A protein has these predicted regions:
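Short, contiguous alpha-helical
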Residues: 6-10, 27-70, 111-154
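Charged, amphipathic alpha-helical oligomerization/scaffolding segments
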Residues: 11, 15, 46, 85-88, ...
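Surface-exposed helix-capping loop/turn segments at secondary-structure junctions
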Residues: 22-29, 97-106, 143-148
Length: 154
């Protein structure tokens, strides 16, 4: 299971990078409109913050302190910086998973998750679904608000 999670998170982060790179401009990354309050840039920051918190700080002991509200308020971060942060998140996830023994997945996650004591496997699997949900939103955002007709093949 650990190898599967590692591979799926690596693929997801690579797809996130491809999506960010597929935006025609930095301004397009931060575009919102109508009933779409979150830009792709903010969703990317949210995913990065999520991984840094749940993998880096909680499993890896990195000391990362999450500011979730800021993930949705920050704006106009450069495309280059987002890509750098995506690559850093890849390392954070890889390092955190590397610290886990396969048996650790069955143990209770170090902090409560959604006000419950659940296994580490449950949390990491849940977070993968959360990641993919927002990745799909980013793809849809790019095509809807920016006018791209095709998927980024991410």
């Amino acid at each position: 299971m650990k190898d599967t999670l590692s591979r799926l998170y690596e693929q997801g982060l690579t797809k996130l990078r491809t999506e960010v790179e597929s935006y025609p401009s930095e301004a397009a990354l931060w575009k919102t409109g109508g009933n779409i309050p979150n830009s792709a840039g903010n969703l990317a920051l949210h995913l990065i913050g999520n991984l840094n918190h749940f993998f880096g700080a909680t499993i890896g002991g990195t000391g990362y302190v999450r500011d979730r509200d800021n993930e949705f308020q920050s704006g106009e971060v450069s495309k280059e910086r987002l890509i750098d942060e995506i690559e850093q998140a890849k390392s954070v996830v890889k390092d955190a998973l590397g610290k886990l023994d396969p048996a650790d997945l069955d143990k209770t996650y170090p902090i409560q998750f959604q006000n419950e004591d659940v296994s580490t496997e449950y949390v990491l699997t849940y977070l993968l679904g959360h990641f993919d949900y927002h990745l799909g939103q980013i793809d849809y955002h790019r095509r809807l608000l920016v006018g791209e007709e095709t998927s980024a093949k991410a």
